[in-house]
């Protein structure tokens, strides 16, 4: 959830400027507590020329234990992984093709075999099911050298599990 809509819109605008340079941008929320339920992003080198700061991603970190989360908070270079991306579709698809082409092949096949149903585009189930069962974070973001992290202060909090 986002509490401050105006700041979020401004962050999206800033992120779009970074994405226009070929980066896959991920919002990182500055932690205010050592939370063990969120993944973290370690801030890398500064990307020059962006108002408000943009950074490379030094590391993606799984949900830590309490001691590790406290260390991340104390160090100051770690941000909660919001799971919110801003990217150019062409750049993203190029990275998917490069890093895990099975995903793109399955998606293209499912789209090619899709059907119009009451004004909805229904993807062909079998082709879609053949796509690897892997998150964008694991398949692309943790492998790409095009990732960028934009710090946000928008009152973000995770909505939790959908399961």
Which residues fall in each region the model found?
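Catalytic core of tubulin tyrosine ligase-like
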Residues: 38-163
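Conserved beta-loop-beta/alpha segment of the NTase-like Rossmann-fold superfamily
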Residues: 1-47, 87, 94-99
